[in-house]
């Protein structure tokens, strides 16, 4: 069986880079066009959605939220803000009840300004920050706005200074920064001890598979491939009702918008992208409606003519 496109949720194991996973998927499935939805550090485990074939064009339209389970070690500051980096300072942590520690976490809930770790993929004057850090160059990273939708204190070990948190956040959030800044707010230090991503871009750990469990036989791999249209289930849907409209679409021409063709099972927001399908529920691409709500503009066209 030939696999042409779709998504596969990989349960990334420790030690692998995201690019390592992409290379292995290319080799196993025999497909050149493969990409991931966002980098996971080598020591971070968990959900890594990977796009195959034409699905790579739809990555930007996936849900952007991500959820992590992480352990933070108080009392230690490192160069990388996790336990892999050089230790820069050690400082005792205060005696805190679970409730008291949870109150400190309020500083990291909602929309916040966050400074990324210096060892990160953020660009600084055209170069990745981690490259500058490894060359011991001095530079400053600007804070950026991120949203912490949920931050739950699961466990608190006062004796060892280790807390476990569950974090649901926007794309671009660094859990290492939360660890570092929490330690600072406690007049101590902090770094990330362990991290696992349990969901990302609408894909969940429970539906993921380890690369080592995949086969070089695509008949066996096929059940793990998620159709692109299923990955876009959160997006409103518009049906092109006839062949003339489909021909217009596939040649990149605008189409008169007919609200009666809207699939009513999804709420409709004219400012957001819409997935376009034919009467047989075949995905045709992504479009937008103009402000007057009269014209459908093609944005991403599959099988363009």
UniProtKB/Swiss-Prot annotation:
CDD domains: PseudoU_synth_EcTruB. It catalyses: uridine(55) in tRNA = pseudouridine(55) in tRNA. Its EC number is 5.4.99.25. Keywords: Isomerase, tRNA processing. It is an enzyme of class 5 (isomerase). Responsible for synthesis of pseudouridine from uracil-55 in the psi GC loop of transfer RNAs. This is tRNA pseudouridine synthase B. It comes from Prochlorococcus marinus subsp. pastoris (strain CCMP1986 / NIES-2087 / MED4).
